């Protein structure tokens, strides 16, 4: 065994350097933890351009877990094992966490039989590819959005591979026409590929061979008592089951180690790696013992437990491999004078906050070397480039080390930990110069896409027709009209009456948004009376809202100016890099504060996504304003816990900036509160953070310039009235993950500015959410699982009276774990004491009511059980779940219910939404679902729903938008709007063999209903061709009819009918088209005439194949206009949602 000595920061450089010199040799670079392994891999990709450098990830689950690892990890591991198996021509460098060397994996030759290489022009069919994917653990869905999923649409197959990377394979008969990458969010293709290699989506491939192995090995290990075992039944049926990866050896006759996948590899390792191997062995033995103890209890699990020797190799077996003579053991040095292999040394002379004059002296001293400065983020890179230019040096931006040049400063986004130098290079990290932080690489879905996701419609939902009232959407149904099939929306009304709406007119119906609705009677006048009644009320609401907004805008405010250098210093103290959305929100606030009007903005961002930091930037700008005398900022929060947390954070962040910060809540004594109020009135306090205690008639401010309202949904009516009085002359910033429907609705009508923070922080994982009947086995497993990974758990009980029962259950289920209780009837000081102990890790489980909904931020607490979750509201559930998974560790939420049969449809719907809204950044979606469930609410009164129930949320929203636009004197289509009806005798529908999923098809129909001009129609058409292939004639007919309908709307044509001998046109009753009609009839007197009922008849022999051309020519002749000059106005007669968000 060779021993080498050099700085720890140069480990990846050393490994890639050795690999580059020995390209036929396999290497394994091991790390002491998973984060280091990933960092080493990223560094290796910079140091070398060799394609045979691989990273083998660890499971994100613990040994003997009953949940499956992340799909991306499963798929990535299988992909790497496939590459290691099939790439025999050259050497390989494998980077992995040392504990992975203990894993027992499928036999080495297994993956050589289960991969597929595709290329354009290759002979292959969609059926063959679909069969391969199913047999290799991929899941077939209507749309592919997650790793390991695929979708088949006619002659197109979409597939998501690790990364995630999405590919679209287009077939033509029995060969592959093209392979393209596509964007998962937009589903639009981006670039072509010459080759695609598809590996299994899991290390376990469910086929006849592996299922047979599983069945035999299962019986041999656990006997025949497997009846009614859902895991066993699922697997032998060829279906995946949560956590079945813990039984991997049962699927194969033999297993291999990771080392077996390489050819006599050289290990590069250190003492920490060896220690990690020993610790992991100790860990999985502990988990095995714990699992065995669980199985002895009466709560029998259907998860059998394999012994450690079945699942893992021993630490002694692996360490024996490490100590063989050709391997390289690394010891680290800290001294520049050490004797070093390859002349690598630490650059310890570069200290943090080195003045840049000293830096460039160092660069001059190493002028014979290539200088490389690595930044961790784009903002850091821009700062380094700017500084380099200021010192009159040339820079060369690089992505790989082999792009580095001499005599210039090479800069790039490079994941270096610390500075070091070699004989040829000097590597300097920007983090040591700028105190730079790693940034999140997650991309933000555009606001338009976030809003689009909300616009869904499901079978069985209540809908509202503008003319006929409330009905229930039953399904899409194809009807035969004049021998041609046409898709219709089938709507049920009272008395079992049915209304059929052609899909091209889908915009005439709106979502009602509430489960409990009474169906209207077709032809009844009661609907029109309800609508007219609400119209008058909406006028009052709209006028009041306009007056509020106008009053705020008339109250001009001096532009907020602050010291930029001091502000930059404040920003530099933020320990993370801002996400793209945070920067956007901060810039929005800057603009608001500088435009001379009072700000009124809502920040909607998921829990833990950085809203507080955005608020702190706003606080700094106002509190340090140069053109105000003693400006004050008030931060209002709903709970004492959140108040204490904010106070601590503000004190830490604003240290050294000369601002007096105080808190006011129930933990503050009456005497101290009186002093604080006095100092507020005199201007001695710059920033006050308070609960409802601050919203008191005795609270007076010297010069309140900014009011920040955190989690507004928790404040009562009286408190909101007091807040209103503060708002009238102050800048206002509201923050919430799930804002109350009223606040969100005001943002969506354009009366309150909206910023969305949808980009998760770096390495954030979504919380896995399970809705289930109470199961003591699963709950015990969940709580012990969290305990054994070194964490703590929340157990939320909605009602105080149920806490005693939960105590009894915990004593029985997990007697080995400790717990304490917190609820609203305890004194604030007692709650504070319990919370402090939980923060410190003095007990395992916090049993509490929903008082933890806001303000708890404990990185080690990542499991939550919610008792009787159906009793809680949607926003409450979302806020509670947001207490866990706030760091790099995955959170698990278990929403227990007594029985699905006992739940109302409303409760069941809430739980379905929270379970399905697992994606990071779902708060905006949750809030909008909340509006659907509760209604938008009366915007200016205390009533939550009122008369809105009579017309439904979407139509109410549209009527309000329209009335606001009228008062604001904005151009809008008249309320007496008509929807053109087009009957051309063509087949109009989306065929099942093109798109089979009815929900997806319905969503596309709704999008079609929102298309407002020819350009949008053509873009939509291009997207459909890209996603699903060439348009069938029936779908093409639909889009042609939409374009004709838009032109009819421009020409005030209410009905256009065709027959064998021509067209009949009926104009809208109030349309003034007399001159155009008379001119048209005069010009085409042989073909055109006006009937006694004022309909225009145009005689022309028609055939199907040219009817679209004929009707377009007719309309162009009639109107003398082109379609592309139609205003960008939807037929709904109101701005679309997406256009209302600024």
From Swiss-Prot:
GO molecular function, one term: damaged DNA binding
Short motif DEEQ box, span: 710-713
UniProt xrefs under InterPro entries: CarD-like/TRCF_RID, CarD-like/TRCF_RID_sf, DEAD/DEAH_box_helicase_dom, Helicase_ATP-bd, Helicase_C-like, Mfd, P-loop_NTPase, RecG/Mfd
Binding site for ATP: 605-612
GO BP terms: regulation of DNA-templated transcription; transcription-coupled nucleotide-excision repair, DNA damage recognition
Keywords on record: ATP-binding, Cytoplasm, DNA damage, DNA repair, DNA-binding, Helicase, Hydrolase, Nucleotide-binding
One Pfam assignment: TRCF
Occurrences of domain Helicase ATP-binding (ranges): 592-757
Domain Helicase C-terminal, chain residue ranges per copy: 778-932
Record's GO cellular component terms: cytoplasm
Family to which the UniProt record says this protein belongs: In the N-terminal section; belongs to the UvrB family. In the C-terminal section; belongs to the helicase family. RecG subfamily.
NCBIfam families linked to this entry: mfd
Record's protein name: Transcription-repair-coupling factor
Organism: Rickettsia felis (strain ATCC VR-1525 / URRWXCal2) (Rickettsia azadi)
Gene designation per UniProt: mfd
């Amino acid at each position: 065994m060779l021993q080498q000595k050099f700085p720890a920061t140069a480990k990846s450089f050393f490994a890639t350097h050795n690999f580059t010199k020995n390209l036929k040799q396999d290497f394994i670079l091991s790390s002491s933890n998973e984060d280091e392994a990933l960092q080493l891999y990223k560094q290796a990709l910079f140091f070398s351009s060799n394609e045979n450098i691989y990273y083998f990830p660890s499971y994100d689950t613990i040994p003997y877990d009953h949940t499956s690892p992340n799909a991306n990890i499963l798929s990535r591991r299988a992909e790497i094992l496939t590459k290691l198996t099939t790439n025999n021509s050259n050497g390989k460098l494998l980077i992995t966490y040392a504990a992975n060397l203990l894993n027992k994996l499928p036999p080495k030759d297994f993956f050589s039989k289960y991969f597929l290489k595709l290329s354009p022009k290759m002979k292959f069919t969609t059926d063959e590819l679909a069969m391969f994917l199913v047999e290799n653990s991929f899941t077939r869905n209507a749309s592919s959005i997650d790793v390991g999923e695929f979708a088949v649409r006619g002659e197109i197959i979409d597939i998501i591979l690790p990364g995630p990377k999405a590919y679209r394979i287009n077939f033509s008969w029995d060969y592959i026409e093209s392979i393209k990458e596509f964007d998962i969010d937009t589903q639009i293709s981006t670039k072509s590929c010459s080759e695609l290699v598809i590996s299994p989506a899991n290390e376990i491939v469910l086929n006849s061979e592996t299922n047979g192995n599983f069945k035999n090995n299962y019986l041999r290990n656990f006997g025949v008592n497997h009846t009614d075992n859902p895991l066993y039944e699922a697997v032998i049926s060829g279906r995946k089951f949560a956590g079945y990866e813990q039984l991997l050896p049962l699927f194969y006759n033999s297993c291999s180690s990771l080392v077996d996948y390489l050819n006599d590899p050289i290990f590069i390792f250190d003492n920490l790696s060896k220690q990690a191997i020993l610790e992991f062995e100790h860990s999985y033995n502990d988990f095995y013992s714990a699992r065995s103890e669980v199985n002895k209890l009466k709560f029998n699990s259907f998860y059998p437990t394999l012994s450690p020797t079945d699942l893992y190799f021993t630490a002694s077996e692996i360490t024996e491999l490490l100590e063989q003579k050709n391997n390289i053991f690394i010891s680290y040095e800290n001294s520049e004078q050490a004797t070093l292999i390859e002349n690598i040394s630490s650059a310890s002379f570069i200290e943090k906050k080195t003045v840049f004059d000293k830096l460039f002296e160092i660069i001059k001293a190493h002028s014979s070397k290539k200088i490389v400065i690595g930044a961790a983020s784009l903002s850091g890179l821009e700062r380094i480039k700017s500084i380099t230019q200021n010192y009159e040096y040339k820079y060369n931006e690089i992505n790989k080390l082999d792009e580095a040049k001499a005599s210039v400063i090479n800069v790039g986004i490079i994941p270096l930990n610390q500075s070091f130098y070699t004989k040829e290079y000097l590597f300097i990290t920007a983090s040591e110069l700028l105190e730079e932080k790693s940034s999140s690489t997650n991309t933000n879905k555009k606001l338009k896409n976030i809003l689009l996701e909300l616009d869904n419609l499901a079978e069985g939902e209540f809908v509202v027709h503008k003319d006929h009232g409330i009905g229930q959407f039953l399904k899409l149904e194809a009807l035969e009209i004049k021998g041609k099939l046409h898709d219709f929306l089938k709507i049920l009304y009272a008395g079992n009456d049915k209304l059929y709406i052609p899909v091209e007119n889908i915009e005439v119906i709106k979502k009602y948004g509430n489960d409990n609705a009474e169906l209207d009677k077709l032809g009844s006048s009661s609907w029109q009376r309800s609508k007219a009644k609400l119209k008058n009320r909406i006028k009052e609401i709209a006028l009041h809202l306009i007056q509020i907004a106008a009053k705020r805008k008339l109250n001009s405010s001096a532009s907020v100016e602050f010291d930029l250098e001091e502000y930059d210093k404040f920003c530099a103290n933020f320990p993370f890099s801002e996400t793209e959305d945070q920067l956007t929100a901060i810039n929005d606030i800057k603009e608001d504060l500088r435009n001379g009007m009072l700000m009124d903005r809502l920040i909607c961002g998921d829990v833990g996504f950085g809203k507080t930091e955005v608020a702190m930037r706003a606080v700094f700008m106002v509190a340090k304003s140069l053109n105000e005398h003693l400006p004050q900022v008030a931060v209002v929060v709903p709970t004492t816990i959140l108040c204490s947390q904010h106070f601590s954070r503000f004190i830490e962040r604003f240290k050294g900036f000369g601002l007096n910060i105080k808190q006011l809540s129930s933990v503050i004594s009456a005497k101290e509160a009186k002093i604080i109020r006095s100092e507020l009135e005199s201007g001695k306090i710059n920033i006050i953070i308070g609960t409802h205690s601050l919203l008191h008639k005795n609270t007076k401010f010297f010069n309140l310039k900014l009011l920040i309202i955190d989690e507004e949904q928790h404040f009562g009516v009286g408190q909101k009235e007091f807040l209103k009085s503060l708002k009238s002359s102050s800048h206002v910033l509201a923050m919430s993950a799930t804002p109350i429907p009223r606040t969100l609705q005001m943002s969506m009508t354009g009366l309150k500015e909206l910023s969305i923070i949808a980009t998760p922080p770096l390495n954030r994982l979504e919380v896995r959410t399970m809705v289930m009947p109470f199961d003591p086995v699963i709950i015990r497993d969940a709580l012990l699982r969290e305990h054994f990974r070194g964490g703590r758990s929340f157990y939320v009980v909605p009602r105080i009276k149920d806490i005693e029962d939960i105590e009894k259950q915990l004593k029985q289920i997990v007697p080995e774990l400790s717990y304490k209780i917190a609820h609203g009837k305890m004194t604030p000081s007692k709650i504070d004491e319990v919370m402090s102990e939980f923060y410190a890790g003095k007990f395992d489980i916090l049993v509490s009511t929903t008082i933890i909904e806001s303000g708890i931020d404990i990185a080690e607490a990542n499991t939550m059980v919610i008792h009787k979750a159906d009793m809680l509201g949607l926003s409450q559930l979302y806020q509670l779940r947001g207490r866990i998974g706030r760091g790099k560790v995955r959170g698990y939420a278990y929403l227990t219910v007594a029985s699905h049969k006992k739940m109302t449809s409303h409760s069941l719907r809430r739980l379905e939404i929270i379970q399905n809204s697992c994606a990071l950044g779902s708060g905006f979606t949750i809030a909008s679902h909340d509006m659907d469930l509760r209604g938008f609410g009366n915007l200016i009164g205390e009533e939550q729903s009122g008369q809105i129930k009579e017309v439904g949320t979407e139509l109410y929203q549209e009527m309000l938008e329209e009335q606001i636009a009228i008062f604001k004197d904005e151009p809008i289509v008249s309320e007496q709007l008509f929807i053109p009806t087009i009957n051309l005798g063509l087949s109009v529908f989306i065929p099942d063999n093109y798109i089979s999923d009815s929900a997806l098809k319905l969503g596309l129909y709704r999008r079609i209903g929102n298309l407002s001009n020819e350009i949008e129609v053509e873009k939509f058409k291009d997207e459909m061709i890209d996603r699903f292939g060439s348009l069938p004639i029936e779908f093409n007919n639909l889009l042609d009819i939409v374009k004709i309908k838009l032109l009819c709307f421009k020409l005030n044509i209410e009905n256009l009918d065709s027959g064998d001998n021509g067209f009949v046109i009926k104009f809208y009753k109030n349309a003034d088209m007399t001159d155009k009609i008379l001119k048209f009839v005069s010009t085409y007197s042989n073909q055109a005439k006006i009937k006694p009922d004022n309909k225009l008849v145009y005689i022309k022999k028609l055939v199907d194949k040219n009817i679209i051309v004929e009707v377009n020519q007719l309309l162009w002749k009639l109107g003398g206009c082109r379609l592309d000059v139609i205003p960008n106005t939807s037929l709904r007669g109101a701005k679309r949602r997406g256009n209302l968000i600024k």
